[in-house]
């Protein structure tokens, strides 16, 4: 099943109503950029916000959501803007959205009921799609930062708090999309979870949720209003105090769960070991840089785990460099039998052939990627960032099959992080990072 060719009943009918373009996190867009033969132009807006993601509701109706990088000083808050997709001018803005003073990126989506939903910190908000006023506000049961917000086929919302190893079990919460009342009992997993959730809707209507834990990947079944752990699918990808770090989000593609570990890098640990999460008495400065050495010696790994047989688990180290680390998950492109992996701490982008059920490095590119990418299977283009030695964060376009660098575009940003790239549907890409939001268009 492919997100870009099947609409999901939980969302407003749009090509990109939610992060990664769909619940399976395949990050694949219809159309093509043809960046190699085009000329790129950039519009950038610089401000004091932590821009996380852009989503589309109606055609041309775009929203950007995020938080504030308020690691010290005045308290943080979440926010959503409706923007002009060409100029990036703000057409409407939400009020400051309470977040329990937790500093983390959160998420937004365009729901089938017409509302814009926003999760940030320990709060969930339902917003009017036109003026972004608050329609409903809900404090979530877990007083921690939350990441990942998905709509399920029945319209209900699901989210989770973020917990590292040794911080107890992560809480998954399911809510009514109108009232934001909690449905059933929140589910506390046997272990913490750092990465965002994914979900898979089968042709027969069965829907399951996938959660990357601190040691296992978990599949959650929906039984009425209740969330139930699937006892038959709990593959282990690491052990306690392992020489590899925790997994970020999973990508569900070709009946396989794709994941990269080594994600709870030093800065992530520091943010989530404070209460409220990400709040410090004095400015933390470079203590929150993702370029710091990894707190383990294991190299970056890519995992391939069958959705039908959890024992069919293949692992590869695409780079082999000690102390690997990332802040965003991989992507799999079934049309090319290729998974894309990277090592943000040490540098390096790799295409990994997934043909015949195996994993084999097909190509390497000497760049330093960190973001959630976008792929265009029709044209074979991968869009991701490269944080350069000069301290600029460029957007690059790469040939999925060969790893050839097709184009490089300066965004005007000097901060890279693990936020989301989004296809605009008109040979364009929206770029979100701390202090910068940009649109790159090819003609």
Identify the meaning behind each predicted range:
Residues 410-443:
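Blade-level signature of beta-propeller repeat domains, shared across WD40, Kelch, NHL, RCC1
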Residues 23-24, 68-74, 123-125, 163-167, ...:
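Short glycine/acidic-enriched loop and turn motifs that connect beta-strands
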Residues 64-77, 161-168, 261-297, 387-388:
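Short, conserved, GDST-rich strand-edge loop motifs in beta-rich repeat architectures
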Residues 47-54, 67-69, 76-113, 121, ...:
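Blade-loop segments of beta-propeller domains
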Residues 325-350, 360-400:
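Loop/turn-rich, solvent-exposed surfaces of beta-rich toroidal or solenoidal domains
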Residues 39-46, 89-98, 133-139, 181-191, ...:
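A short beta-strand motif characteristic of beta-propeller blades
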Residues 48-56, 99-109, 142-153, 191-202, ...:
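Repeated scaffold domains used in trafficking and secretory/extracellular systems
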Residues 2-78, 99-106:
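Beta-strand-rich domains and repeat architectures in extracellular enzymes and scaffolds
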